[in-house]
Amino acid sequence: MQASKYDPQGLLDKLDKFQLDAFNKAMRLGSMCIFGDTGFGKTRVATAIMMELFATGKIKTVLICGPKSALEVWPQELSLFTCPIRVTYLNYERAPSLVDIKLPSYDLIIADESHRLKNRNSVQSKILWRLGRKAKYRLALSGTPQGNSVEDYFAQFRFVDPEVFGGNFKEFATAFMLPCGWMNKKWEINPDKEDLFNSIIHEYSYRITKEEALTLPPITIHRVPFELHGDAREAYEKMVEEHLLEINDTEIDATLAITLVGKLQQICSGFIYGEELNIFESLDKVATLLKILPTEKVVIFCKYEAEIQLLRAVLKNRFILIYTGETKNKEIWKEFQNTDKYDVFLANLKTGGTGLNLQSACKLIFFSTGYSYLDFYQARDRVYRRGQTKPVDIYCLYAKGTIEESIYEVLDEKGKSAKQVLDDYRLKLLPQKK
């Protein structure tokens, strides 16, 4: 495609109402978080902001940071405009290499998928904070800024504007949070400070959901329980019994707890990793999947490699495209999206759950998932996004009375918490339709 003549107003004319609202707010604030939902067009809005700042002589240099999958989108977007702006790209994974060097200065820094910075103690988060302090303007882009708890906002706003919540987490926690969870190592909003916290979030950000910005078909989440039987049930109960005392011990090592949860999940899926991979005779989850598996295109997400290989063998009569961290051709997903060559997209949750457009399918199955609300939400939106024309069905398989059931309960709570901060407070301030 031939590049358009550089024309900020022409670019602004291409923005829809919500995108233009985000643009105007960013121009007023200077630095801001854009928390537009998947499909909102955050890249296009940030590009318009960049071009306008350049056209008015406010910036000359730009640094765009993000994961590799997000950075690949930007050159294509910017190639549409013949603008002599100097743009540098930084993969978050390369940030640690900058620890011991003098950091350069940029006029504008954009942190794409800013939720990757939520760990305030990570090298990536600290490097972006240091870079941001030298920049005149800063933008943070994320459709899922809150993955686990409200503390996820601190590092993102520390990058955008340290004056919002301050640069010290202890002061931030004292002002807005209460300790909770195991050994009080987690944080939740102090109910007395909830409205103040939410008002500050929305004062320095722009939020819109896909339901508000797009015309999408309905989505239905189906919880699909099954009973765990036979040798799998015996193995599960034995492992719980053996580790019961450790679970009740407040001094339990966090790594041990994570390992235990993982092994219990594996048993629910019909296998367990040990010195060798042990496959159980009772494959209840596989049997449940086969009962609900549609004949049309379907996306299946798994947490473990063994699950992918197990389903690959079971679904040998289907046309399967496997997508994992070992997949060399990262563009092969397009053959599922754009052709009828494959009817099953079988993917690792971490690898295939972000950055892919899979809306040629309207059915998605979570064979397994973890506690990360961010991973779950991002994976769900591979099929529920701009361009989807059919009603979407999401199926979540879990063994009743096991760790899998509690995982979905935790995801529900995390989703409610994120919605409370991002949407409920904002929506109650909007004029009510009569």
Label each PLM-derived region with a short phrase.
Residues M1-M32, Q76, L80-V87, N91-E93, ...:
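Charged, low-complexity
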Residues M1-Q2, D13, R28-S31, D37-G41, ...:
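Conserved Helicase C-terminal RecA-like lobe
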Residues T61, L108, S125-E212, Q388-P391:
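Conserved P-loop NTPase motor "coupling/switch" region that bridges the ATPase
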Residues S69-V87, V160-E163, N317:
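Conserved helix-turn-beta segment of the N-terminal RecA-like "Helicase ATP-binding" lobe
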Residues Y92-L108, N119, R130:
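Conserved helix/coil segment N-terminal to the catalytic DExD/H
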Residues P96-D100, G147-V150, A306-R312, K330-W333, ...:
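SF2 helicase motor core recognition
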Residues D112-E113:
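Walker B catalytic acidic pair
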Residues Y371-K434:
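A conserved SF2-helicase RecA2
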